Amino acid sequence: MAVNANQGKVAIVTGGGSGIGKAAALALLGDGWSVALAGRRAEALEQVANSPDAKGRALAVATDVTDPASVKALFEMTVKTWGRVDLLFNNAGMGLGGAALEDITVDDWKRVVDTNLNGMFYCIQQAFRVMKSQQPMGGRIINNGSISAHAPRPGSIAYTATKHAVTGLTKTAALDGRKYDIAVGQIDIGNAVTELAARMVKGVPQANGEIRTEPLMDVDIVGRSVLYMASLPLDANVLFHTVMATKMPFVGRG
């Protein structure tokens, strides 16, 4: 019988109560990982933690990624429970739902930046601190970018700006992590079926001004993609991985 190399490995998944985070967490749990589920909605996290695949290997940790102290507590709780962190799926994010550029308030702009950029940095920083200090040293970080890390949608300036910034975080953290055996990569996802993408079925603005529905893909495909990236040995890394609905507007939005 083959030995599962991932059995007993430890992951943190932010935004783990729904959508992409939930799909990734369930894929990891199904493969034998222990998973700390982080997010703001404790009830949603508990539902995932109590799923059949969890088998006592899931921990729900209410977390606000925009608060450095809350992120620090998440990592401390994970290490206290399982002794280490092998994977961070840095997934928590938000958008403004197609708000016109001139109507975005300063508070809304700051909220998106605080979640999608600052929160992601706080998680990367804590992961580095833990992964550098543990034995064996090292681990993997997978940042959730987006097709919007390549090309924008109309009315998405805050979301797109932060997702472009995530690419900068990924490239720099990948470089800085080399000497500590910390592999850093990014998954850029297009049109997975989630609450965030639900408006696609009603039609969304296109670059030419039209309103069109767009094809979607099963979010479980994203979960399996994250699991594949997470399962590589630390001497190999998927730096950038794009997974998208085949017939959606491509990364150039054409």
Each model region followed by its residue ranges:
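Substrate-binding pocket helix/loop in short-chain dehydrogenase/reductase
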Residues: 99-101, 108-110
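The beta1-alpha1 cofactor-binding region of Rossmann-like NAD(H)/NADP(H)-dependent oxidoreductases
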Residues: 62-74, 106
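C-terminal helical subdomain
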Residues: 186-187, 205-252
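Conserved glycine-rich Rossmann-like NAD(P)H-binding loop of the short-chain dehydrogenase/reductase
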Residues: 31-47
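Active-site helix of classical SDR
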Residues: 124, 162
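Conserved glycine-rich cofactor-binding loop
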Residues: 17-19
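Residue(s) in the substrate-gating loop at a strand-loop-helix junction
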Residues: 146
